[in-house]
Curated annotation (Swiss-Prot):
GO terms for molecular function: 4 iron, 4 sulfur cluster binding; anaerobic carbon-monoxide dehydrogenase activity; CO-methylating acetyl-CoA synthase activity; metal ion binding. Tetramer of two alpha and two beta chains. This is Carbon monoxide dehydrogenase/acetyl-CoA synthase subunit alpha. Binds 2 nickel ions per subunit. Binds 1 [4Fe-4S] cluster per subunit. SUPFAM superfamilies: Prismane protein-like (SSF56821). It holds the Pfam family CODH_A_N. GO terms for biological process: acetyl-CoA metabolic process; carbon fixation. InterPro entries: ACS_CODH_B_C, CO_DH/Ac-CoA_synth_bsu, CO_DH/Ac-CoA_synth_bsu_3_sf, CODH_A_N, Prismane-like_a/b-sand, Prismane-like_sf. [4Fe-4S] cluster binds at C506, C509, C518, C528. It comes from Moorella thermoacetica (Clostridium thermoaceticum). The lineage of its organism: Bacteria, Bacillati, Bacillota, Clostridia, Moorellales. Keywords: 4Fe-4S, Carbon dioxide fixation, Iron, Iron-sulfur, Metal-binding, Nickel, Transferase. It catalyses: Co(I)-[corrinoid Fe-S protein] + acetyl-CoA + H(+) = methyl-Co(III)-[corrinoid Fe-S protein] + CO + CoA. It is an enzyme of class 2 (transferase).
Amino acid sequence: MTDFDKIFEGAIPEGKEPVALFREVYHGAITATSYAEILLNQAIRTYGPDHPVGYPDTAYYLPVIRCFSGEEVKKLGDLPPILNRKRAQVSPVLNFENARLAGEATWYAAEIIEALRYLKYKPDEPLLPPPWTGFIGDPVVRRFGIKMVDWTIPGEAIILGRAKDSKALAKIVKELMGMGFMLFICDEAVEQLLEENVKLGIDYIAYPLGNFTQIVHAANYALRAGMMFGGVTPGAREEQRDYQRRRIRAFVLYLGEHDMVKTAAAFGAIFTGFPVITDQPLPEDKQIPDWFFSVEDYDKIVQIAMETRGIKLTKIKLDLPINFGPAFEGESIRKGDMYVEMGGNRTPAFELVRTVSESEITDGKIEVIGPDIDQIPEGSKLPLGILVDIYGRKMQADFEGVLERRIHDFINYGEGLWHTGQRNINWLRVSKDAVAKGFRFKNYGEILVAKMKEEFPAIVDRVQVTIFTDEAKVKEYMEVAREKYKERDDRMRGLTDETVDTFYSCVLCQSFAPNHVCIVTPERVGLCGAVSWLDAKASYEINHAGPNQPIPKEGEIDPIKGIWKSVNDYLYTASNRNLEQVCLYTLMENPMTSCGCFEAIMAILPECNGIMITTRDHAGMTPSGMTFSTLAGMIGGGTQTPGFMGIGRTYIVSKKFISADGGIARIVWMPKSLKDFLHDEFVRRSVEEGLGEDFIDKIADETIGTTVDEILPYLEEKGHPALTMDPIM
């Protein structure tokens, strides 16, 4: 027995062994591994042992196998010895330990069966029609990494089988979505939810995986998080199980009639530390308290599952006519589904958070000035102003922009609400469905009052929201907003690394990557792109013991490379004594660590004397010879990798962007989508650096090539400055 397995000690009272359950698991594991063997032999006969095998968009081969035993499975011939070894661990001796090992073997069998399915995969011909996902690629795991790290996603719920009642299942799923859970759904439960018009798919963090063995894609998603963010070494089986138990707070809802293979797969979850709760009545010889047990009441099943897994939520429950939670943040509202639209250059619109005095505010007051949604016809376009007044004893003018940017998140949490942009270039839509359920403009105010207080309790004492839809009032307050924006921008222009005496740490991701430390400065956003210096400063005011700690800028060692003694001292302690020095302004010597939530990766291209940058959203090959996923697997987990580094996208247009290495003049390749995202600011910075307005056109992208040999002639033809700079190495 391993140290991890001690968590199972005492789970079964002496003399109460559920032998019938263990027998079911044994037969299920034998069936699963035998089926995998038959399919594998057929595949080898058809394709040959040297035929490639793997999933798309991952650097982790077959993740269950890579994680638990470390093998880099690349071809069909690699699989028979692995399957034979796992089949041999399925023992006819019926006890809890052997049942868990049989569960692990079932996960291996399911992974092999699914990998064989992907032998027929073509990028332009998905194996499953939307919204079914099948295997979920690394970019999606990383996309939601920061929400897992900061517990916006409080846990993972894996739902398999068929519910007694589709409406009751829809209620369970909506409850879980409202609380922010990541959902993995398999078998007939998917069809039941689609019948009830529950929104499923990657954008809703609710993955309809498919049927039967496709449940393994929940397992290979969770296991990649350990390797991706936690730096768990492939094959470190016990360390990975410990990580899953501590960091990935998952549970399984096993619904409907039991099947021996599904039950064996459920024991794979138990092997990894995830409890299994079923809605079926279970006799005493088929239960294990806290690990495999029955809750027949659908109104209690989620609460008991959360209690069993140790998940406690303290979020404010809003009384809204629509569902509300992070699951809906990625929802799009198409024109045909829209009831009303505001801003987006179609009508005047703005949003503003401003600090007011105690006498200027009535806490909780929400006022709508102008027509409400029920007073306008479907398809209308309205002007909109959102004015959020804040009073707080510790509130500072510098925090206004931090709170204002969260309006985007908070509104998007509403099902049927859509928000993009900020300040006076915001754009909002409300769906027909949300209006039919009773959504009105005052609900915007209720959301903002509650969330501002919940998220910023240390600096926000009172909140008042005014919603303007009267055009004259919108235009009047738009001028007030513009004056505020100008004041902020003037203040921010003076905020540089040189003008402050304090940097901030961000160790939020240490819940996933224990040795990773971000150093956030006025001119360097956190690598997730979500934490600026002002965000970190506000976070510290909210929670002095939180993830963002002030680091006095003391003991300057090298101002060119960006080395300070105080920063190094903090780094050494915060990285669990793993790192001794960080250079903030160079890629080439002791760069910042990378966890796994980064928006982009930069990598040295010595042949071009420069660097390339790729993003989480770009799945294609790069001139480094690696995709984003492969690069991310190489540098993630809290390690320093000179020549490679994860970054937030806006850092690229900072004056401190690898300034010791030559700055933006070193960039020789980046995806076209990144060029488009940064375009105006990048051109402005290029002019500031004396590189000219057309410098962005001298940088190659995927339309020019994806290898050094393809892009080098282009760089030479365009006279790219990196080619004549001092050697980068």
